């Protein structure tokens, strides 16, 4: 696991070394490089696409968020895997209601993947462990 010491970036290229497979995933027009460019160009604010999604929720706790820190490729230990999962961007934010932590999965033109029902039907034992763990953490059991 990487150290939990964070160094501010000077450009999007600083994000490349944090990828699980930097040479494979760092390509123009793909999600990793596009995400870095988007967040870097918006700093110190949240990207407008994120603001719009949160505004659509109509939840006042998700409105007028101030970005405190954006951490690229945040590693999350989940059961059932042989390596940590990586969140594209972990954003620490706040507003008058308090602190909000956002986990962002960024996509350019890729699919998010199969639905949970489809994934569960073909899940390996490790994937099943992860799904069950997340369902329990989010208090949303599949049954």
Placement of each model-derived feature along the sequence:
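Generic hydrophobic, helix-prone segments enriched in Leu/Val/Ile
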Residues: 67-70, 100, 131-138
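Short glycine-rich, polar/acidic loop-and-turn segments at beta strand-coil junctions
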Residues: 72, 93-95, 108
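Active-site beta-strand-loop-beta-strand hairpin of nuclease catalytic cores
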Residues: 91-103
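Acidic, metal/cofactor-coordinating or nucleic-acid-engaging core segments within structured domains
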Residues: 112-143
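Short, well-structured alpha-helical interface segments that form or flank functional binding sites
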Residues: 82-87, 99, 143
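Conserved beta-strand->loop/alpha-helix structural units within folded catalytic cores of enzymes
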Residues: 86-90, 106
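Nuclease-adjacent, charged terminal/linker segments that flank catalytic cores
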Residues: 1-79, 84
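Short loop/turn segments at strand-loop or loop-helix junctions that form parts
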Residues: 103-110, 138
